From Swiss-Prot:
<dbReference type="InterPro" id="IPR037198">
    <property type="entry name" value="MutL_C_sf"/>
</dbReference>
<dbReference type="InterPro" id="IPR036890">
    <property type="entry name" value="HATPase_C_sf"/>
</dbReference>
<dbReference type="InterPro" id="IPR014762">
    <property type="entry name" value="DNA_mismatch_repair_CS"/>
</dbReference>
<dbReference type="InterPro" id="IPR042121">
    <property type="entry name" value="MutL_C_regsub"/>
</dbReference>
<dbReference type="GO" id="GO:0032300">
    <property type="term" value="C:mismatch repair complex"/>
</dbReference>
<dbReference type="InterPro" id="IPR002099">
    <property type="entry name" value="MutL/Mlh/PMS"/>
</dbReference>
<dbReference type="InterPro" id="IPR020568">
    <property type="entry name" value="Ribosomal_Su5_D2-typ_SF"/>
</dbReference>
<keyword id="KW-0227">DNA damage</keyword>
<keyword id="KW-0234">DNA repair</keyword>
<dbReference type="Pfam" id="PF08676">
    <property type="entry name" value="MutL_C"/>
</dbReference>
<dbReference type="GO" id="GO:0005524">
    <property type="term" value="F:ATP binding"/>
</dbReference>
<dbReference type="InterPro" id="IPR042120">
    <property type="entry name" value="MutL_C_dimsub"/>
</dbReference>
<dbReference type="InterPro" id="IPR038973">
    <property type="entry name" value="MutL/Mlh/Pms-like"/>
</dbReference>
<dbReference type="InterPro" id="IPR020667">
    <property type="entry name" value="DNA_mismatch_repair_MutL"/>
</dbReference>
<dbReference type="Pfam" id="PF13589">
    <property type="entry name" value="HATPase_c_3"/>
</dbReference>
<dbReference type="GO" id="GO:0140664">
    <property type="term" value="F:ATP-dependent DNA damage sensor activity"/>
</dbReference>
<dbReference type="Pfam" id="PF01119">
    <property type="entry name" value="DNA_mis_repair"/>
</dbReference>
Amino acid sequence: MIIRHLSENIINQIAAGEVIERPANVVKELVENAIDAEATRIEIVTTNGGKNFIRVSDNGCGIPADQLTLAVSRHCTSKITDDVHNICFLGFRGEALPSIGSVAKLKLTSRTQNAESAAEIIVTAGKIVGPKPAAANPGTIVEVRDLFFVTPARLKFMKTDRAETNSITDMIKRIAIAFPHIHFSLSGSDRTSLELPATANNTQGQLQRITQIMGKEFAPNSIVLNAERESVRLTGFACLPSFNRSNSLHQFAYVNGRPVRDKFLWGAIRGAYADVMTRDRYPVSILFIDLPPADVDVNVHPTKADVRFRDPGFIRGLIVGAIREALHHTGVRSTSTRSEAMLAAFQTQKPLKTFKSTYKPSSYSPQPYHVESASMVNKPLDIISPVGLKEDAPPLMEGLDIPSGDAYTPNTPAASEECSYPLGAARAQIHKNYIIAQTQDSLIIVDQHAAHERLVYEALKNALYSKPLPSQLLLIPEIVELSEEDATCLLTHKDALQKFGLGIEAFGPGAIVVRETPSLLGEINVEALIKDLADEAAEYDTTDNLKTMLDYVAATMACHGSIRSGRLLHPEEMNALLRQIEATPNTGTCNHGRPTYIELKLADIERLFGRK
């Protein structure tokens, strides 16, 4: 077999296969070139999902007529010279235009801001014609026709026109979020599908642009991020855990303004939400990471979608710390989306049919619910046990450094102050699972199981950094058979598990004896618990992942040790639960990311009844 030089055209087609996989890649490369040219308005037109026609026009600085030939030649660029480690532009390789021209019909028309006329050049399957004079406004227009007509086999891998159009739209949205000061317009054969007017290039402008793309529900459910450590700055928005999605399509990350889809960053975001969201849900977040160009390598993938950080551990720590700190300082807050959904669910009922009433007055006169004093509203939750209602049950949070409701004791009678708490005063319990509370201007519905599950979980986590949880000695220690590897792995975490109140010891090869279990959990299936913990320990058998494992252990214990649905609560218990929710961090959601409560404003209730 003879080794030979490939022709320039074949080389370009091979390069195009790496850079241009589908129409969305063409649009991405052309839009990035327009942004690098300092355009403030970019218009995109496509037909048939970009397979037949793509046009990207901008009002940027333009390309001089004598440089058009270089613009469509490989490895010719104005953005870098010899320093490939200090890249400040979105594009830099000089591959996009020649790659497109080698597999499609390309026409490039451009005019600089000071030129009297424009010029155009045409590239068809790698063959260049021009440049020649043309008529156009200052800026650049790139038209691409019959994509992959040179390699028709590639067309078989294209998706439907609708799917390709959706891919282009998603890509434009991701770029537009990072550049709110640029006007973006995307249209198809017969209509404009996306119109994003320019906004201010600041945090408020970014939020306005994000609202244009994500919808009006994003802003009230988001938290502003602003953290800086050494030479790295993290800004953006992290949404409440209860405002989540079933996939990662609503996670956006930008490194020095470049949109990226990097698994490392997705993992850092999931790590930040690990103990407030279930594993099968994805948080909504938008992160902007700005750091010196020399500290990140953007030249690791042909499409520049992946990046490599010089110190990935530092970046992960910054992301996780900033998001968790922001969530911690949100206080008692849950998503507003479900409240809006509840409002939408109410429909004006049709008038009831007239019927002859058989009602007879009753002598019964119901007594209104009334709390005797503020101390009752603020009474600690001291009779809730994980295994049932017991008169002599110890306080739920006894021995743990969890803030109690005592800090909220008012000095005035409860009649005037009971509704001033963030979650108000309990008025009723319905279906033995939902607490109805009243504030000064709203109605609160609390899921007692979800709320108490979060309280127990936070108490368990708190035990890791303070005194251990109380435990109960088993009358007959239980022996659990495991594989020798699992037993050894679990025993390495013996001290950490002891803080949870779980006492284990080795009992020969491949066996563990359990002598103590957490008092908080009551009666449990010890064998099932140990085997689950062994699986968690095997999955996270590193020092870095120990905390993750312990968080999952705490979450599992909390779910089994919290108030169950169907449990009847007294008014004192309900009010004490509300006070503990207010005094405990991260109580807007349970361990699985579900909301612990929803709020319905009085104005919304009045609107439902036509009063406003």
